[in-house]
From Swiss-Prot:
SUPFAM superfamilies: Nucleotide-diphospho-sugar transferases (SSF53448). Activates KDO (a required 8-carbon sugar) for incorporation into bacterial lipopolysaccharide in Gram-negative bacteria. GO terms for biological process: CMP-keto-3-deoxy-D-manno-octulosonic acid biosynthetic process; lipopolysaccharide biosynthetic process. This is 3-deoxy-manno-octulosonate cytidylyltransferase. Belongs to the KdsB family. It holds the Pfam family CTP_transf_3. Gene3D superfamilies: Spore Coat Polysaccharide Biosynthesis Protein SpsA, Chain A (3.90.550.10). NCBIfam families: kdsB, PRK05450.1-5, PRK13368.1. It comes from Neisseria gonorrhoeae (strain ATCC 700825 / FA 1090).
Length: 253
């Protein structure tokens, strides 16, 4: 297994659930729960990257390594680029970006995403899982990804892609049958050198329109390998209902 580290971007502001990074989950802040879950992977190191002193204090209180970054970042990826530089991580080292609102993320998925980066010899890797629910296909909060024959991303979108034209014309709520529909899983792997390059790339109009940071990579002509997970991962925390569900899971552990 190639060595990798996990970096977790964490900010306090959240439009749908303010302060969620520090939301209590069975006695510990969510960001700490995420870091502890990531530590179950094969990562050599797990570090939280944040711009808020309260998150820094919470991590330090629970023995989680943390690095402070600027509060001017518009994406988690550019925050991690700054964190990697501050930590003096070597250019060849693999970084897995684990979102700060994924306290139930599977450690195996973290490992596999790093492996996919190496196996495909690409600049960036991510993951997706098959989608079978029509409402999710139409839901803009469920990001979809379509792949080429080699398993690389063609496009990510909040729109329903691929669009089932004939079924929609007929007024049918049917999923496309010719190919699998994939929902994107928000986990990324890249080497530190490419992470720094990403931060230097110009912002693409597509990422602005869709509010999807990974579209910058496609816009600038770099392939993104996509691992198709065998099953859907546990959902992250975006709303109070999500938080209540996750709290219930930890209460049973």
């Amino acid at each position: 297994m190639t060595e990798f580290v996990v970096l977790i971007p964490a900010r306090l502001d959240s439009s749908r659930l303010p302060g969620k990074a520090l939301a209590d989950i069975h006695g510990k802040p969510m960001v700490v729960r995420v870091a502890e879950q990531a530590a179950k992977s094969k990562a050599a190191r797990v570090v939280v990257a944040t711009d808020h002193p309260d998150i820094q204090t919470a991590c330090q209180a629970h023995g989680i390594e943390v690095v402070m970054t600027s509060n001017r970042h518009e994406s988690g990826t550019t925050r991690l680029a700054e964190a990697a530089a501050a930590l003096k991580l070597p250019p060849h080292l693999i970084v897995v970006n684990v979102q700060g609102d994924e306290p139930l993320i599977a450690p195996e998925l973290i490992d596999r995403t790093a492996e996919v980066l190496v196996e495909n010899n690409v600049q960036m890797a991510t993951a997706g899982h098959e989608l079978h629910d029509f409402d999710e296909l139409m839901n803009p909060n469920a990001v979809k990804v379509v792949l080429d024959k080699n398993g690389n991303a063609i496009y990510f979108s909040r729109a329903p892609i691929p669009y089932p034209r004939d079924a929609m014309r007929a007024g049918k709520r049917e999923m496309p049958s010719e190919t699998a529909v994939l929902r994107h899983i928000g986990i990324y792997a890249y080497r530190v050198g490419f992470l720094q390059r990403y931060a230097e790339m110009s912002v693409s109009p597509l990422e602005t329109i869709e509010s999807l940071e990974q579209l910058r990579v496609l816009w600038h002509g770099y392939p993104i390998a996509v691992e198709t997970a065998k099953e859907a991962p546990a959902a992250g925390v975006d709303t109070q209902e999500d938080l209540d569900r996750v709290r219930a899971v930890f209460q049973t552990v």
